[in-house]
């Protein structure tokens, strides 16, 4: 039986790195990670811009970890499942905690999904292809998005707030 392989990248002390380590240990995955410095991030900007084919600062900033992640994963696999869109789909960003109610969260989720698909797919595709890696984005599948968005606002909000308190 083949062991599930997981990857994460970031900077030391990142809560995402800590969470990835915990999940890997819990699930028993073959976990690989790469911790990059600010200097390393700055040094790859020309490559990121080249592969993204844009000078858009926010897209470049968000593509830097994807670049490191694709470079790491390409040493082990040819195809990856990414988490692109999961933070948006399940209201995982901190600013969602400040929403006045579940209806506001639902409205914001609907708003951001009009633009998310193109930006996230472009970034994931171009950074993985830069390293000969294919990325699949299951959280951006229209059927997954539709199913999650049909969950009652009140129910999804209760789940969100319960999970955030863990």
Task: Identify the residue ranges that each predicted region occupies.
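ATP-dependent adenylate-handling active sites, centered on carboxylate activation for C-N bond formation
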Residues: 1-166
């Amino acid at each position: 039986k083949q062991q599930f392989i997981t990857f994460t990248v970031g900077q030391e002390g990142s809560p995402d790195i800590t969470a990835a380590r915990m999940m890997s240990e819990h699930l028993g995955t073959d976990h690989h990670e790469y911790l990059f410095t600010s200097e390393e991030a700055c040094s790859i900007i020309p490559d990121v811009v080249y592969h993204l084919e844009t000078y858009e600062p926010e897209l470049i900033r968000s593509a830097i970890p994807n670049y490191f992640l694709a470079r790491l994963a390409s040493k082990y696999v040819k195809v990856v499942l990414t988490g692109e869109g999961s933070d948006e789909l399940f209201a995982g960003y901190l600013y969602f905690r400040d929403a006045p109610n579940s209806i506001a969260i639902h409205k914001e989720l609907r708003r951001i999904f009009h633009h998310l698909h193109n930006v996230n797919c472009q970034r994931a595709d171009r950074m993985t292809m830069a390293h000969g890696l294919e990325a699949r984005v299951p959280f951006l599948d229209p059927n997954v998005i539709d199913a999650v968005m049909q969950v009652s606002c009140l129910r999804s909000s209760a789940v969100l707030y319960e999970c955030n308190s863990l």
